[in-house]
């Protein structure tokens, strides 16, 4: 026999062959045993702070993950991190956002490197840990950055495991292989179905790790007990979650340049106007506790625990019923198998699956429209929202308008001169706002700096020579402001912050709050959440039992931070409200779409909870009827587990259809709120043309009209503030107080 070998390679002798054969054995001996592996795995799961720090950066903006005390230590720890970064040359802006669990930094890449920022954060963390005497500090919380790939990777692995388990279960069922008793999954079911046990495990290893661990255990049990119906529902849920995560990452990728370009900017174009986090605050103070954890009074600094929704109520009741039925089966029937099957029958699988499918589909559709999910868990709380707080600044447009004037001539003159004024430019008392010929508009407030966009507006004096007349400047309403308030009314109670410029639509709100004062404080500091006006209002509503959704731009950042669901508007040229859960664009139509999902979310959860209770009741009944001595068979398995699986599948389909229907609605036509009675004919035509895009030139000079798919705007007259009659000068001859609206 001829041995084939490469040239120059000698054939191994017996000694070499023996050593080669013994090598795998020595390697196996060097590997840790199962017990050591289990201890190491437990150590890694319970100390997630040992994994590498997550960092995202692009074009002069960086989001750096915080670890330990730097993240959970409250305002003082957050201030230490941001102050250390601000001291670096080239850093324009730095602020900790506990919603993301990161410090957000705007910097000049030519002066400072990202590695320098990370090193500075690490130095502060080590100093804080040394002061606290806690070693490496507390473990990380569970928040995820939308650009991270870890959640998508974890869900993909879980999908692969569930799919493999489904194949094993289906193959075993077809070839009639022996299966493990269905009751073998009772232990996993007890941990998964008992809210307290699940919460204790989540506190130990984190909510995301808990979901994965229980998912893997359920897949393993489903494969051994040959339950492809259960695994099929799990696979569909994983697919929906993966689609949601991928859509969210793509949405952030599309808008990253736009969002990070404005990260270091002030809230207004005028350098004299402090932005969020500046001397006049308004970005909201971080609480001692962040957004970590699924519930409880410490979650987001809530004054009381988050109220239970239909899914939580059904889960708690079924958990108690499952333990009671399992105990009865064990004591009365003296059958561990019967007890385990009764526990499995009480699993709230349909309730969770229905809400999860609705939330995942809603997140995917919103992300496809450019809405960035900074914290997608808020979509799982949409079914509990019963109060919507709208910050009036989010409803404003981009043009200055006259709210009131001494007489009609003053109104017309001021309206003409204010046409190109930036509504967020601030003025000192006596400063000239605009000038035209011999007429000047002068700021007439008492002290400080004021803007037309401020809640009380900008008082003006119209001076022509020695003659002066008074006027009040405000901001036009966004065309979809009324649609947002009407959509909010469909969610429950509507709370609106008081603002002179939104008085026309304030009647759509149930409660009008006075504008929150802007507290004075040291530069670089941020107001405490308890001291911040809007955040305090949110906490008062929460203490009264409400689940609050806040709609705001960057001026309501502290309210977004305290809200149960925060919907933020990222206006062009201004810093995005990173404290929001859902980051919309500059159009209110995005907010309208988010609010449209809330009533169907509540209805879907109620329907899923009803299906879950009904399926569990039927499954428990069939289990009792079959008795502990029934022989295992396909028919018996279908009778025992079929109702729960059928209820879960129905809930999944219901959630999917409900979310798609909620997303399908057409955007309403914009409504134009204008003081038509106070305008001249030429001014009215100009205003209408600017708002609708219509051509106001003479008919002979207009091009041929082209068809458009955009809805025509509705026209409404601006109403005076409630309780205040307009001065006679605001009404032209024969004008009515409120003009009728033209249809679309």
Where are each of the predicted segments found?
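Extended, compositionally biased intrinsically disordered regions at domain boundaries
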Residues: 2-62
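Short acidic amphipathic segments
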Residues: 50-52, 57, 61-111, 123, ...
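Conserved short beta-strand edge segments in small beta-sheet-based binding/regulatory domains
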Residues: 56, 119, 123-144
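Acidic, Ser/Thr-rich low-complexity segments on the non-lumenal side of membrane proteins
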Residues: 61-81, 383-405, 693-698
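Short, charged/polar, Gly/Pro-enriched secondary-structure boundary elements
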Residues: 72, 110-115, 442, 447-449
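Hydrophobic alpha-helical transmembrane segments
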Residues: 165-387, 392, 398, 409, ...
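Conserved ATP-binding TGD loop and adjacent catalytic N/P-domain core of P-type ATPases
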Residues: 445-649, 656-724, 732-734
């Amino acid at each position: 026999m001829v041995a084939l070998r490469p040239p120059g390679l000698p054939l191994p002798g017996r000694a070499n062959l023996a050593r080669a054969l013994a090598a795998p054995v020595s390697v196996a001996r060097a590997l840790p045993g199962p017990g050591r592996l289990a201890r190491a795995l437990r150590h890694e799961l319970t100390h997630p702070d040992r994994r590498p720090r997550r960092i995202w950066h692009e074009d002069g903006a960086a989001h750096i993950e915080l670890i330990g005390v730097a993240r959970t230590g409250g305002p003082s720890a957050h201030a230490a991190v941001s102050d250390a970064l601000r001291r670096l040359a080239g850093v324009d802006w730095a602020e900790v956002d506990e919603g993301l669990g990161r410090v957000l930094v705007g910097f000049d890449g030519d002066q400072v490197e990202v590695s320098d920022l990370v090193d500075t954060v690490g130095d502060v963390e080590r100093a804080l840990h040394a002061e606290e005497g806690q070693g490496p500090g507390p473990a990380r919380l569970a928040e995820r950055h939308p650009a991270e790939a870890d959640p998508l990777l974890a869900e993909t692995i879980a999908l692969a495991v569930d799919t493999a388990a489904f194949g094993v279960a289906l193959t075993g069922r077809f070839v009639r292989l022996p299966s493990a008793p269905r009751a073998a999954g009772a232990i996993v079911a007890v941990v998964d179905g008992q809210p307290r046990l699940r919460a204790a495990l989540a506190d130990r290893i984190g909510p995301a790790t808990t979901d994965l661990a229980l998912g893997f255990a359920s897949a393993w049990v489903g494969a051994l007990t040959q339950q492809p119906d259960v695994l099929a529902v799990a696979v569909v849920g994983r697919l929906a979650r993966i689609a949601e995560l991928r859509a969210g990452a793509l949405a952030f990728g599309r808008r990253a340049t736009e969002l990070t370009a404005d990260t270091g900017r002030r809230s207004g174009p005028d350098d004299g106007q402090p932005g969020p986090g500046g001397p006049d605050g308004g970005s909201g103070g971080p609480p001692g506790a962040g957004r970590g954890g699924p519930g409880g009074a410490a979650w987001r600094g809530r004054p009381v625990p988050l109220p239970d929704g239909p899914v939580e109520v059904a889960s708690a009741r079924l958990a108690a019923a499952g333990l009671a039925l399992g105990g009865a089966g064990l004591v009365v029937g003296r059958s561990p198998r019967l007890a385990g099957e009764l526990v499995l029958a009480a699993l709230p699988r349909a309730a969770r699956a229905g809400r999860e499918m609705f939330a995942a589909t809603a997140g995917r559709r919103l992300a496809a429209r450019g809405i960035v999910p900074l914290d997608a868990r808020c979509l799982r709380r949409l079914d509990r929202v019963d109060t919507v707080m709208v910050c009036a600044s989010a409803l404003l447009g981009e043009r200055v308008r006259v709210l009131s004037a001494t007489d009609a001539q003053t109104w017309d003159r001021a309206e003409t001169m204010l046409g190109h004024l930036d509504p967020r430019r601030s003025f000192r008392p006596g400063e000239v706002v605009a000038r035209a010929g011999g007429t000047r508009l002068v700021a007439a407030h008492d002290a400080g700096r004021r803007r037309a966009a401020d809640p009380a507006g900008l008082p003006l004096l119209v001076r022509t020579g020695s003659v002066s007349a008074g006027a009040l400047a405000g901001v036009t309403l966004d065309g979809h402001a009324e649609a947002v308030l009407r959509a909010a009314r469909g969610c429950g109670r509507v709370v609106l912050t008081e603002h002179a410029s939104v008085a026309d639509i304030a009647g759509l709100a149930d409660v009008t709050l006075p504008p929150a004062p802007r507290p004075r404080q040291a530069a670089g500091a941020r107001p405490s959440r308890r001291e911040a006006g809007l955040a305090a209002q949110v906490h008062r509503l929460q203490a009264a039992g409400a689940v609050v959704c806040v709609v705001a731009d960057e001026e309501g950042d502290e309210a977004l931070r305290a809200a149960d669901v925060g919907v933020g508007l990222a206006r062009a040229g201004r810093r995005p409200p990173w404290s929001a859960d859902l980051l919309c664009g500059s159009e209110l139509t995005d907010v309208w779409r988010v609010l449209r999902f809330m009533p169907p979310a509540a209805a879907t959860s109620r329907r899923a909870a009803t299906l879950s209770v009904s399926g569990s009741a039927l499954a428990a009944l069939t289990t009792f009827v079959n008795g502990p001595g029934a022989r295992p068979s396909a028919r018996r398995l279908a009778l025992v587990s079929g109702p729960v699986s059928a209820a879960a599948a129905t809930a999944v389909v219901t959630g999917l259809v409900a979310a798609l229907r909620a997303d399908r609605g057409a955007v309403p036509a914009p409504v134009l709120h204008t003081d038509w009675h106070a305008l001249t004919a030429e001014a009215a035509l100009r205003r209408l043309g600017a708002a609708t895009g219509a051509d106001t030139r003479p008919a002979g000079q207009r091009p041929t009209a082209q068809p458009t798919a955009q809805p025509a705007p509705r026209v409404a007259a601006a109403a005076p503030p409630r309780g205040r009659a307009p001065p006679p000068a605001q009404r032209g001859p024969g004008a009515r107080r409120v003009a009728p609206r033209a249809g679309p």
